[in-house]
Amino acid sequence: MFVFKNKQSSFKLGTITFGGNPGEFPTILIGGLFFKGQDVVENTRKGTFNEVLTKEWINTAESMSERTGHPLILQIYGRTEDAIENHISWISENFEGPFIFESINPKTRVRGLEYCQESGLFNRAIFNSINISSTDAEKEAIQNSSLETAISLGWSPKATSLEERMQTIKDIVETTDTLGVKNIIADPGTMPVGAGYGLELRTLLAMKSELGLPSCIAPHNAPSAWSFIKQNDFNQESLHTASVVASTVAAQLFTADCIMFGSLVRSEEVFTAVALIGNAISAAIAEAYHTLDIDRDLFEPKTFQ
């Protein structure tokens, strides 16, 4: 199990602690909502969705979080400015914890920032993400807002080695800091299987070892384009879930503090797997600390039986 020499920074958002040493705090799980193709989605442009089914998904995830001790964060996607506003508004009224908001559209991300500012939600909202493609308008909106927490996505198509990936991360973290963001979560970026998947796991260790920042990762992206699980003679949904679970616990073992596991509908499978590995990490770290004579509080899994 991994024990880092450098200090590991942490911060709190509500009742949830981000960062810290491996095993010190429970792994945070981030479930996605309102992405195209999800059963809850009705109209991506207008931001309409099945509120009853969405609430069922949230209730299930909250129950699993309570039973395992692993915190839950919601990842909200919005295709348009109207959609991101509708989604954030509804989630802020129907979920008490922190949430991430994002879009592939820069104008939509800016509207998300503006809405959170207008609604006083920056004590809960996390911006995803500041990266090499961030526009000047986004950066200006961030500087003019009360945004406290953001993800720094350290990915570049030119960064194909650990050294290059780390330099990209350092550059983006520096940019995030200059924009006035207090709480920075570093994300090395996840590539699909066959297109670089795996380097981000090595990069996670380097990030924690060298920078000591809270980390997050979206390993569910790895099997997203994996042709192996899309063969006609396979139960594709079953294999997709298995792949998401496997990629999630791999990231957990490689010291990710927060893990985006894709669709919230997979909460039961993902939380159960992470709880199991959480027990393994707890026992391994306790033994390592005893051997190294380190006195530090550790997360005690609720599922230790």
Task: State where each predicted segment sits.
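Active-site beta->alpha loop and helix N-cap motifs at the rims of alpha/beta catalytic domains
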Residues: S9-E164
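Catalytic alpha/beta core domains of metabolic enzymes, predominantly
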Residues: I142-A286
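Generic structural signal for short, flexible, solvent-exposed coil/loop and linker residues
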Residues: K5-K7, T17-G19, I88, T175, ...
